[in-house]
Amino acid sequence: MQPNDITFYQRFEADILAGRKTITIRDKSESYFKAGDILRVGRFEDNQYFCTIEVLSVSPITLDELTEQHAKQENMGLAELREVIKTIYPNESEFWVIEIRLVN
């Protein structure tokens, strides 16, 4: 069994599979992805594979630079997006927006 390249919390699985979540915002530890990468995706909770995605772009961003468009791409409101990021990365201020496309 191949290892997964990236994981998402289970609550995001349906949105990824339906194409409603088209970006992910990560900290520096996951800023190495690049456009064209094909990634196996697993659930964070159990590492179970659930799809394959392609990275379309990777760009730096701060919490204050997040817009309604980013929130829409995450399938949530802007205030909710900022709260989710602060909860996942409480001590970080610089992030990377990874634009993704579902492959299968």
From Swiss-Prot:
The molecular function terms in GO held by this entry are: hydrolase activity, acting on carbon-nitrogen (but not peptide) bonds, in linear amidines; N4-acetylcytidine amidohydrolase activity
What the entry lists under SMART domains is as follows: ASCH
The active site consists of 21, 24, 74
EC number, UniProt record = 3.5.1.135
The question of whether Hydrolase is a record keyword is answered with: yes
Q: Does the keyword Transferase apply?
A: no
The record lists the catalysed reaction(s) as: N(4)-acetylcytidine + H2O = cytidine + acetate + H(+); N(4)-acetyl-2'-deoxycytidine + H2O = 2'-deoxycytidine + acetate + H(+); N(4)-acetylcytosine + H2O = cytosine + acetate + H(+)
Enzyme class name: hydrolase
Give GO cellular component annotations, separated by semicolons: cytosol
Domain of life per record: Bacteria
**Which keywords does the record carry?**
Hydrolase
Which InterPro entries does this entry report, sorted A to Z? Answer: AC4CH, ASCH_domain, PUA-like_sf
SUPFAM superfamilies linked: PUA domain-like
Any Pfam family from its record, for instance, is ASCH
Q: Where is the ASCH domain?
A: 6-102
NCBIfam families from the UniProt entry: PRK04980.1
Q: Summarize the protein's role.
A: Catalyzes the hydrolysis of N(4)-acetylcytidine (ac4C).
Q: Which family does it belong to?
A: Belongs to the N(4)-acetylcytidine amidohydrolase family.
Name of protein: N(4)-acetylcytidine amidohydrolase
